[in-house]
Curated annotation (Swiss-Prot):
PANTHER family reported for this sequence: FRATAXIN, FRATAXIN, MITOCHONDRIAL
SUPFAM superfamilies recorded: Frataxin/Nqo15-like (SSF55387)
Signal peptide (residue range): none
Protein name: Iron-sulfur cluster assembly protein CyaY
GO biological process, one term: intracellular iron ion homeostasis
Length: 104
């Protein structure tokens, strides 16, 4: 994947995460702050940071629950080297339903 394709895919993914949270978090429990390619989610469990790493073509997640993760895009999914999927992990930790195939 070239840099342009990665940037577009990563941006689409982060915007998708923001949209799903805003759609489902009707009580405003999660404070969403998107600045460029850095997304901060302030939750009852702590602050999540999601950002893109163009050089490695990865999305990085810092979770107050499960720690740091690096995700690469493969076969329609953002996966970590140890087998986690980004959308599945966010669903489990945030309680927001992310259809992992919806944006692809």
């Amino acid at each position: 994947m070239n840099n342009t394709a990665f940037s577009k895919l990563a941006e689409t993914t982060i915007v998708y995460i923001v949209d799903k949270i805003e759609e489902q978090d009707l009580e405003g429990i999660i404070d969403v702050d998107l600045q460029g390619d850095i997304l901060n989610l302030d939750t009852e469990n702590g602050i999540y940071v999601i950002n893109t790493q163009s050089a490695s073509k990865e999305i990085w997640l810092s979770s107050p629950v499960s720690g740091p993760h690096h995700f690469f895009y493969e076969q329609g999914k953002w996966k970590s080297r140890i087998g986690f999927e980004l959308m599945v992990l966010l669903t489990e930790e945030l309680g927001i339903r992310f259809d992992k195939y919806e944006i692809f």
